[in-house]
Every structure is written in structure tokens, then in C-alpha cells.
Amino acid sequence: MFDILLSYISRSTFITIFVLSWLSIYFILTFSILISKMIYLSSWIYRENKALESLLLGSKNINIPSILRKCIKGNITKEKLDVCISMSEKNATSGLTWLSIIASTSPFIGLFGTVVSILDTFANMGSGNAGLSVIAPAISEALVATGAGIFVAIPAYTFHLLIKRKAYEVINIIKRSADVILFNNKDQI
């Protein structure tokens, strides 16, 4: 397996190696964002659920580390809670832009590598070695870049949707908590 990879790299052009390296970085970044955001959002959802439960049980204050805990110090206003919700939304959705960029550009980056490799193959055809035994392997190797681009784009798009759903879930819990806080403190507002 390792020999096949080394053989492929030794026959590849600079552009193909550059494209595959770029896609490898994208692939690693995709999984890094997934793992970090899923751990972060899952623990955040747990904390916000606990805070919401506490509020629903009649507590006027949030004793659990919640994003709204900072917002209920001093005067409680709807505007102040809305600002906290907006800040939470920004934190919850960070990383989604990168996943979107990776999902949308990876196939094009792979296609670019394929086109350059096929152009190189056609340029070599003019040298006289234009047999099918020479052209077919070169074109099949060129298509590896397109396959790699699609291989990177699919998980990036999938992870984008998964994280977007988790972010929606945490923001929804925070909004419900803000509603309960406003209701519990309506006499102060």
C-alpha cells in the first residue's frame, strides 16, 4: 500500500501533489472542526439544559454555568438578553463557514488537479508515445485528484449540517431560558 502511494507520488506533477496536499489539509481541518465543535456544543447543551431545568423549577437565578448567567446581573431587560443570545449564536456557529468553504471548493480543487494532469498527459502524447498503455494510466491517475476532492467535500458538507443542527439546538435552549427569565422577573422589568 505504501509502495503504491510512493509510486503514485513519484509519477505525479507538482500541481497534482500540491492539490492533494491542499485537500489533505482540508480533510484534517474538517475532522478537527467536527470533533472540537461536537464536544464543545454537546457540553454546552448539557449546561444550558440544566440551567433551563433550574429556571423551570422556579429558581430566579442561574447557579449553573450558563451563557445567560452573565446577562442577568444587574437589571434584566429583553434587549440585554437578546445581545447575549446573539453572542451565543456567534459562538455556536463558529467553524461553519470553514466547513462550507471546504465543502464547496474541494471538488473544484480536485477538478483543477485533474485538468492539469490531463493537459500534461496530452502534452506528452505529442512526444510520440501516444499508445493506450501510456495514456490510460495517466488519465486514471489524473482522476484521483477529482476523487480526492469529492472525498473531502462529502464529510465537510455532512459535518456542516450536523454542527448547524447542534448550534440551533443550543440557541433554542438559550432562547427558552431567556423567556423563562423574563417571565420570572416580569415584576422587575
Model-derived features: positions:
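Predominantly long cytosolic amphipathic alpha-helical stalk/bundle segments
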Residues: I33, I39-G131, T158-I189
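Residue-level signature of catalytic and energy-coupling elements of molecular machines
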Residues: F31, P107-G110, I139, G149
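Transmembrane alpha-helix/interfacial motif
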Residues: I9-K50
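Short leucine-rich amphipathic alpha-helical surface patches
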Residues: A123-G126, L143, G147
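Alpha-helical membrane-interface segments at transmembrane helix boundaries
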Residues: L6-T13, E89-A103, S133-V144
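Hydrophobic alpha-helical transmembrane segments of polytopic membrane proteins
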Residues: V144-T158
